[in-house]
């Protein structure tokens, strides 16, 4: 893509870009060439610039199959598969989400708090697959009143770390 314009909106900096010219793709179902069917503007979140959230406004061509009516747009390799954001923004959020609050990170990047939370959950799920937990040599058990109820906290006293926090006292 090529950036062509930049302007300030109320809460974000908008970078307008156009996609590079692409030849008409083949229909995945019919195996015949698709024809051009107008353009579409899409907005994607990107990493902050000048301490302001950034939105990429990308204008992409759309293609349509004449026989089956299926629509297609060229894929952008820098976008995340799950979200309307760039891969580098998702990487920045993954690096910072465990060290700062979700609200502060959402305000800084201009995405919703739930988006930050979902990225953090994906990171935690990934870490649970790769990180190996050791059983504490010296175990401490206590309870804490958190979020309106008592919870059981199991700690590793040898390393002064929380090993597990259970939903209830028992």
List PLM regions with ranges:
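Short, conserved DNA-binding cores of transcription-related domains
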Residues: 1-76
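Mobile genetic element proteins and their domesticated derivatives, centered on retroelements
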Residues: 15-16, 27-30, 65, 93, ...
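Residue-level detection of the helix-turn-helix DNA-binding "recognition helix"
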Residues: 32, 110, 121, 125
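Short, Lys/Arg-enriched anionic-surface-contact patches
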Residues: 69-89
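Short, amphipathic alpha-helical "recognition" segments used to contact nucleic acids or chromatin
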Residues: 86-100
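Residues in the recognition helix of alpha-helical DNA-binding motifs
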Residues: 96, 108, 119
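Short coil turns linking two alpha-helices in DNA-binding domains
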Residues: 101, 112-115
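RNase H-like nuclease fold core
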Residues: 118-170
